[in-house]
């Protein structure tokens, strides 16, 4: 009948982390008038910038500054926000989800953005008090409270805080605690830091830079057992080493929250499997963020997740198929005074032409890896000013044969020595 408006589609988003928050932004940029949007999140507050937890711990910013979406944000945009609630099951035949409160919420289209959880380590007695993960605002709040009272009772220990994990998150957590005046020791099972982004030489430069910021390191070792009755007293290592400590932060990576989707019969192994348009094996369910698996890969950095949000928003709002591509992403470290950049391949092989500049006194190490006159990897520490230029050359597969001798000297040198295209070549093109 004329005059009747088309019924809105019920769009239900499970999860309210960074992926869900960015996806909402992308929806609103387009047109959500055809949707009745509901967001369910297990944390009480709205979406916040999780990658800024390290600066909050370090005291370089505060909690209000990283809350991107307070409750009023959802209300003002006509979005229903159900906070502090978990989804326990997906009932695909009925097209509804069952919540931890026993309620059922219907959907026409479901988006899973349930993120990930901290990876576990094979150590005994992890139930002791003062052993934390570093994943949520609650984690940071507990660490800050502990840091404020780290000298309680005058207890003497080898270190105030033990951080497990030499990846980006572990290094940033260690730095934040050190800024609070705690004596920090970081343990990493590899022989060098950031071993998935840096070569051993760069890892050594990074270690020295962080030691200057009052962080100690134990490398090529693992915690096998925590000691204490109720509260943490110390840690025992596989090597036989023992260390007394007051608190521990475990930051050894993430595990995708795939269980909700897989229990409902969705396909996946490492995560909930999606295609290039973020669709799962059920046409009524999509997924994005750290919970997904795409061509065998999972995701922990924001850049590819932002692209996933664009891809899904285009498909749902405009029925435009803009395929997601898992492109290279550079690594940067959020530690004040430590300039680090890594992209692409980082371990030299016989296939590479290696360009290296080192200045031990200044703490500068710059390495480029070339294959067939194209940059395939860049590792910079101490001076990362040209990182984005190198990354652009890498992604564009630019032929750098003419400027290779000048690449490590900096932009002014390699741009000056780059040969302009001749007029004959231009006309021929």
Q: Which residues does each predicted region cover?
A:
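C-terminal auxiliary extensions adjacent to catalytic cores
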Residues: 361-423
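Rossmann-like NAD(P)H-binding beta-loop-alpha module
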Residues: 142-198
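A Rossmann-like FAD-binding core segment of flavoenzymes
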Residues: 36, 81-98, 105, 179-274
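Short hydrophobic core segments
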Residues: 14, 105-115, 243-253, 309, ...
């Amino acid at each position: 009948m004329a005059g009747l408006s088309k019924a809105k589609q019920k769009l239900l988003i499970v999860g309210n982390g960074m992926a869900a928050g960015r996806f909402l932004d992308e929806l609103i940029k387009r047109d959500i008038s055809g949707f009745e949007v509901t967001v369910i999140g297990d944390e009480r507050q709205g979406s916040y910038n999780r990658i800024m937890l390290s600066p909050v711990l370090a005291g370089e910013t505060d909690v209000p500054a990283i809350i991107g979406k307070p409750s009023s944000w959802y209300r003002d945009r006509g979005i229903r926000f159900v906070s502090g609630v978990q989804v326990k099951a997906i009932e695909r035949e009925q097209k509804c989800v069952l919540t931890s409160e026993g309620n059922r919420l219907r959907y026409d289209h479901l988006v899973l953005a349930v993120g990930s959880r901290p990876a576990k380590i094979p150590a005994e007695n992890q139930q002791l008090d003062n052993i934390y993960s570093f994943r949520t605002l609650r984690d940071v709040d507990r660490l800050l409270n502990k840091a404020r009272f780290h000298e309680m009772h005058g207890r003497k220990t080898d270190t105030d805080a033990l951080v497990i994990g030499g990846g980006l998150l572990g290094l940033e957590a260690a730095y934040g605690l050190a800024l609070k005046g705690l004596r920090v020791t970081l343990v990493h099972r590899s022989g060098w830091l950031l071993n998935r982004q840096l070569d051993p030489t760069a890892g050594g430069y990074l270690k020295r830079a962080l030691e200057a910021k009052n962080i100690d390191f134990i490398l090529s070792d693992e915690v096998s057992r925590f000691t204490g009755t109720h509260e943490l007293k110390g840690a025992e290592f596989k090597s036989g080493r023992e260390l007394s400590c007051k608190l521990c932060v475990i930051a050894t990576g993430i595990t995708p929250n795939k269980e909700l989707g897989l229990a409902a019969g969705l396909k996946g192994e490492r995560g909930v499997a999606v295609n290039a348009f973020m669709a799962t094996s059920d046409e009524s369910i999509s997924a994005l963020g750290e919970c997904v698996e795409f061509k065998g890969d999972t995701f922990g950095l924001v850049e590819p997740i932002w692209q996933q949000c664009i891809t899904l928003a285009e498909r749902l709002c405009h029925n435009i198929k803009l395929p997601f591509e898992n492109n290279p992403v550079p690594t940067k470290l959020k530690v004040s005074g430590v300039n680090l950049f890594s992209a692409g391949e980082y371990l030299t092989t016989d296939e590479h032409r290696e360009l290296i500049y080192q200045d031990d006194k200044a703490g500068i190490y710059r390495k480029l890896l070339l294959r067939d006159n194209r940059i395939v990897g860049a590792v910079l520490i101490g001076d990362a000013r040209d990182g984005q230029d190198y990354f652009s050359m890498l992604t564009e597969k630019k032929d750098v044969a003419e400027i290779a001798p000048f690449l490590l000297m900096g932009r002014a040198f390699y741009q000056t020595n780059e040969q302009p295209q001749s007029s004959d070549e231009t006309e021929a093109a």
